[in-house]
Protein backbone atom coordinates (compact mmCIF):
# COMPACT_ATOMS: atom_id res chain seq x y z
CA UNK A 1 0.00 0.00 0.00
CA UNK A 2 1.45 3.35 -0.99
CA UNK A 3 1.65 6.22 1.45
CA UNK A 4 -0.50 9.23 0.61
CA UNK A 5 -0.92 12.38 2.66
CA UNK A 6 -3.73 14.57 1.30
CA UNK A 7 -2.57 17.66 3.21
CA UNK A 8 1.09 17.30 2.26
CA UNK A 9 2.76 20.42 0.88
CA UNK A 10 5.90 19.86 -1.16
CA UNK A 11 8.64 22.42 -0.65
CA UNK A 12 11.23 23.42 -3.22
CA UNK A 13 14.41 25.45 -3.06
CA UNK A 14 15.32 28.37 -5.33
CA UNK A 15 16.68 26.04 -8.00
CA UNK A 16 13.55 23.88 -8.20
CA UNK A 17 14.83 20.92 -6.18
CA UNK A 18 12.37 19.22 -3.85
CA UNK A 19 13.66 19.73 -0.30
CA UNK A 20 14.08 16.44 1.56
CA UNK A 21 15.68 15.26 4.80
CA UNK A 22 16.80 11.81 5.92
CA UNK A 23 18.75 10.10 8.69
CA UNK A 24 21.18 7.25 8.78
CA UNK A 25 19.86 5.71 12.01
CA UNK A 26 22.53 3.79 13.89
CA UNK A 27 22.10 1.31 16.72
CA UNK A 28 25.11 2.81 18.55
CA UNK A 29 27.71 5.55 18.25
CA UNK A 30 30.06 3.01 16.65
CA UNK A 31 27.94 3.44 13.50
CA UNK A 32 28.35 -0.17 12.40
CA UNK A 33 24.65 -1.12 12.18
CA UNK A 34 22.15 1.04 10.29
CA UNK A 35 18.35 0.84 10.29
CA UNK A 36 16.60 0.59 6.92
CA UNK A 37 12.86 0.59 6.26
CA UNK A 38 10.79 -1.07 3.57
CA UNK A 39 9.78 1.15 0.66
CA UNK A 40 6.13 2.22 0.59
CA UNK A 41 6.07 1.70 -3.20
CA UNK A 42 8.03 -1.58 -3.31
CA UNK A 43 7.67 -3.33 0.08
CA UNK A 44 10.35 -5.93 -0.74
CA UNK A 45 13.00 -3.20 -1.15
CA UNK A 46 14.87 -1.40 1.65
CA UNK A 47 15.48 2.36 1.83
CA UNK A 48 16.94 4.98 4.18
CA UNK A 49 14.08 6.68 6.08
CA UNK A 50 13.44 10.24 4.93
CA UNK A 51 11.03 12.46 3.09
CA UNK A 52 9.92 15.91 2.08
CA UNK A 53 10.41 18.95 4.26
CA UNK A 54 7.34 20.90 5.29
CA UNK A 55 7.11 24.68 4.85
CA UNK A 56 9.22 26.57 7.43
CA UNK A 57 10.70 23.29 8.70
CA UNK A 58 14.44 23.08 9.39
CA UNK A 59 16.27 20.13 7.77
CA UNK A 60 17.27 18.57 11.12
CA UNK A 61 13.71 18.75 12.44
CA UNK A 62 12.36 17.25 9.23
CA UNK A 63 14.87 14.39 9.40
CA UNK A 64 13.89 13.56 13.00
CA UNK A 65 10.16 13.73 12.13
CA UNK A 66 10.60 11.48 9.09
CA UNK A 67 12.46 8.73 10.96
CA UNK A 68 9.84 8.84 13.71
CA UNK A 69 7.03 8.41 11.13
CA UNK A 70 8.75 5.91 8.84
CA UNK A 71 11.00 3.89 11.18
CA UNK A 72 9.35 4.36 14.58
CA UNK A 73 12.56 5.45 16.29
CA UNK A 74 13.74 8.41 18.32
CA UNK A 75 17.32 9.32 18.97
CA UNK A 76 20.14 11.78 19.27
CA UNK A 77 20.56 13.82 16.10
CA UNK A 78 24.21 14.07 15.15
CA UNK A 79 26.17 15.66 12.36
CA UNK A 80 25.00 16.62 8.89
CA UNK A 81 26.66 14.05 6.65
CA UNK A 82 26.02 16.04 3.48
CA UNK A 83 23.48 17.37 1.03
CA UNK A 84 22.83 14.97 -1.83
CA UNK A 85 21.25 15.76 -5.18
CA UNK A 86 19.32 13.38 -7.37
CA UNK A 87 18.67 14.57 -10.91
CA UNK A 88 17.61 11.51 -12.90
CA UNK A 89 13.87 10.97 -12.53
CA UNK A 90 13.06 13.64 -9.96
CA UNK A 91 15.03 16.63 -8.78
CA UNK A 92 15.62 16.09 -5.06
CA UNK A 93 18.06 17.75 -2.70
CA UNK A 94 18.33 15.73 0.51
CA UNK A 95 19.94 16.79 3.79
CA UNK A 96 21.30 13.59 5.33
CA UNK A 97 22.04 13.43 9.06
CA UNK A 98 23.42 10.81 11.40
CA UNK A 99 21.15 9.76 14.27
CA UNK A 100 21.97 7.44 17.18
CA UNK A 101 18.80 5.53 18.12
CA UNK A 102 17.80 5.78 21.79
CA UNK A 103 14.18 4.57 21.61
CA UNK A 104 12.42 2.02 19.39
CA UNK A 105 8.62 2.09 19.26
CA UNK A 106 6.80 -1.22 18.99
CA UNK A 107 4.09 0.23 16.75
CA UNK A 108 4.55 3.40 14.72
CA UNK A 109 2.62 5.43 12.15
CA UNK A 110 3.82 3.70 8.97
CA UNK A 111 3.81 0.18 10.46
CA UNK A 112 0.17 0.57 11.43
CA UNK A 113 -1.02 2.49 8.35
CA UNK A 114 0.91 0.85 5.50
CA UNK A 115 2.64 -2.19 7.03
CA UNK A 116 6.13 -0.72 6.76
CA UNK A 117 8.92 -2.87 8.18
CA UNK A 118 12.36 -2.00 9.56
CA UNK A 119 15.55 -3.99 9.91
CA UNK A 120 19.11 -3.50 11.18
CA UNK A 121 21.90 -4.05 8.66
CA UNK A 122 25.67 -4.04 8.93
CA UNK A 123 26.84 -1.00 6.95
CA UNK A 124 28.48 -3.15 4.24
CA UNK A 125 25.30 -5.22 3.80
CA UNK A 126 23.13 -2.09 3.68
CA UNK A 127 25.27 -0.66 0.88
CA UNK A 128 24.82 -3.86 -1.15
CA UNK A 129 21.05 -3.91 -0.57
CA UNK A 130 20.66 -0.23 -1.52
CA UNK A 131 22.93 -0.21 -4.59
CA UNK A 132 20.45 -2.18 -6.70
CA UNK A 133 17.42 0.11 -6.52
CA UNK A 134 18.43 3.21 -4.49
CA UNK A 135 22.04 3.99 -5.43
CA UNK A 136 21.86 7.51 -4.01
CA UNK A 137 20.96 6.00 -0.61
CA UNK A 138 23.99 3.71 -0.88
CA UNK A 139 26.06 6.85 -1.53
CA UNK A 140 25.08 8.20 1.90
CA UNK A 141 26.76 5.21 3.53
CA UNK A 142 29.70 5.28 1.11
CA UNK A 143 30.35 8.90 2.10
CA UNK A 144 30.17 7.92 5.77
CA UNK A 145 32.80 5.22 5.17
CA UNK A 146 35.03 7.63 3.22
CA UNK A 147 35.92 9.66 6.24
CA UNK A 148 33.00 11.13 8.10
CA UNK A 149 32.87 8.46 10.79
CA UNK A 150 33.44 9.49 14.41
CA UNK A 151 36.66 7.47 14.54
CA UNK A 152 38.60 9.99 12.45
CA UNK A 153 37.73 13.06 14.48
CA UNK A 154 35.35 14.62 11.94
CA UNK A 155 32.39 14.25 14.25
CA UNK A 156 31.03 17.73 13.60
CA UNK A 157 30.28 19.46 10.34
CA UNK A 158 29.82 23.22 10.52
CA UNK A 159 26.52 24.46 9.17
CA UNK A 160 27.00 26.17 5.85
CA UNK A 161 24.89 28.88 4.26
CA UNK A 162 22.82 27.63 1.32
CA UNK A 163 25.13 29.15 -1.28
CA UNK A 164 28.24 27.41 0.10
CA UNK A 165 26.76 24.01 0.96
CA UNK A 166 28.54 20.80 0.02
CA UNK A 167 26.56 18.92 -2.61
CA UNK A 168 27.15 15.36 -3.73
CA UNK A 169 25.23 14.34 -6.83
CA UNK A 170 24.11 10.84 -7.70
CA UNK A 171 26.36 11.03 -10.77
CA UNK A 172 29.49 11.51 -8.65
CA UNK A 173 31.36 8.49 -7.38
CA UNK A 174 34.45 7.72 -5.36
CA UNK A 175 36.46 10.01 -7.65
CA UNK A 176 35.82 12.90 -5.28
CA UNK A 177 38.94 14.71 -4.11
CA UNK A 178 39.77 14.04 -0.47
CA UNK A 179 39.02 17.66 0.45
CA UNK A 180 35.37 17.10 -0.55
CA UNK A 181 35.00 13.85 1.35
Swiss-Prot record:
Enzyme class at the top of the EC tree: hydrolase
Pfam families attached to this UniProt entry: NUDIX
Residues the record marks as active site: 69
Any one Gene Ontology molecular-function term assigned to this protein's record: bis(5'-adenosyl)-pentaphosphatase activity
Binding site for substrate: 10, 18-20, 39-41, 90-92, 116, 134
Binding site for Mg(2+) 1: 50, 70
Cofactor note: Binds 3 Mg(2+) or Mn(2+) ions per subunit.
Protein name: Diphosphoinositol polyphosphate phosphohydrolase NUDT4B
Organism placement in taxonomy: Eukaryota, Metazoa, Chordata, Craniata, Vertebrata
Gene name for this UniProt entry: NUDT4B
Amino acid sequence: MMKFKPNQTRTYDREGFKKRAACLCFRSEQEDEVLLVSSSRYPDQWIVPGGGMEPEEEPGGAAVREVYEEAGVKGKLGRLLGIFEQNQDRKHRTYVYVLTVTEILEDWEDSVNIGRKREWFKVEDAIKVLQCHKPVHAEYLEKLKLGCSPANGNSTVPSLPDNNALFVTAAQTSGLPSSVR
